[in-house]
Amino acid sequence: MIIFRRCVFINHRDFQVNEQIRDKEVRLIDQDGKQIGIMSAKEAYKIAQERHLDLVKIVPNANPPVCKLMDFGKYRYELSKREKEAKKKQKIINVKEIRMSPNIEDHDFGVKLKSAIKFLKDGDKVKVTIRFRGREAAHTSLAEDLLKRFAEELREYGNVEKAPSMDGRNMMMVIAPKKQ
C-alpha cells in the first residue's frame, strides 16, 4: 500500500492541516460541501488519504471543530489570487503637501494653486501648510484667511477634509478631491 504524503507549507493564516489536527473529534465535510459526520481526527485523516486530499481545519472554534477535505495547495493558490485581485481594486491615495508663508505674493499663490489643482485632478489629497517664522506666529488670523481663500479657489476641485488648525508653528488644512 502506497501512502501519499503532501508537503504542506503553512502560510500566514496558520491553517491546521493533516497530522497537525490534534482534536479528538471533528465534524467532517467533503470537497463538495456535504457533511460526512462527526468522527475522530484519525479517521478523518484516513479518509483524506484514501481520497488523495488534505484534511484542513476551517472552523477551529466550533464544537467539535469543522474540518474539510480539499486540495490545500489549490486552496492556498485561490486565496492568494483573491488577495491579489483585492489589492488591484484598491485605490492608493497620496497626500501631497504644499507649503506657503503667511505673507505670500499673489503670483506665488497662483502657482501653488495650480499645483494643488493638478494634485486634486490626479486624485491625491492636498495638505496645505503655512509655516510661521519668528513674529509671524502672532498673526495667525492672516494665515487662516489665506487658507480659507485657498480652499475657496479649490472649491470646484475638492472639499476641505480638515479645517485650518494650528500644529506647533504651522497652520495646516487638508483638501480631498471631489468624487466623480
From Swiss-Prot:
Major localization listed first in the record, in broad terms: cytoplasm
Classification via SUPFAM superfamilies: Translation initiation factor IF3, C-terminal domain, Translation initiation factor IF3, N-terminal domain
Top-level lineage group: Bacteria
The keyword Transmembrane is annotated on this UniProt entry: no
A GO cellular-component term linked to this record: membrane
One MF annotation (Gene Ontology) recorded for this entry: translation initiation factor activity
Quaternary structure, from the entry: Monomer.
General function of this protein: IF-3 binds to the 30S ribosomal subunit and shifts the equilibrium between 70S ribosomes and their 50S and 30S subunits in favor of the free subunits, thus enhancing the availability of 30S subunits on which protein synthesis initiation begins.
UniProt record similarity statement: Belongs to the IF-3 family.
Protein name: Translation initiation factor IF-3
Primary gene name: infC
